[in-house]
Amino acid sequence: MGIWVRTPDLGQSENVVWNRAANRTQSSGRAVGGRLYLTRERLLFEPNRVDAITGGSNWQAPLGHIAGVSRESPDGQAFSGGLRARLRLDLADGSVELFVVNHLDEVIRTIRQATGHPV
């Protein structure tokens, strides 16, 4: 989708319906800059090209595997995005993904609508 962040690999019938700049908490000491993409099937994260070269990972989850969408309070971890409230995704396998995004409440509403969770 751009020079800074590569276009996500999509299925043949898949289209991006929404996207937003985001930082993904990849570990307790690292947040990776990039972009969140929403399709009618999945939520995906693509790291920016610099973070991808230095070990930043892409991520994806089918919408049906997102069990919860909420706000994670700041935890004080400066290098993993923990100085701000973050988007929290609880997944069906019990894992948690955290993302720093602007307009957090709007993002939560958008993803809740897409996953069929109460807005």
Where are the regions that the model predicts?
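Anionic N-terminal interaction surfaces
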Residues: M1-E41, S57-W59, S80-L83, D90-A92, ...
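Structural motif
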Residues: R35, R42-L44, H65, S95-V96
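Phosphoinositide-dependent membrane-docking surfaces
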Residues: L43, N58-D75
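Eukaryotic short linear interaction motifs
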Residues: F45, A52, E97, V107-I108
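Short aromatic-glycine motifs in intrinsically disordered, low-complexity regions
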Residues: P47-Q60
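Short acidic, glycine-rich loop/turn motifs
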Residues: P47-R49, L89-D93
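Short acidic, Gly/Pro-enriched loop/turn segments at secondary-structure junctions
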Residues: V50-I53, G68-A85
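Short, well-ordered, aromatic-rich surface patches in folded extracellular/luminal domains
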Residues: I111
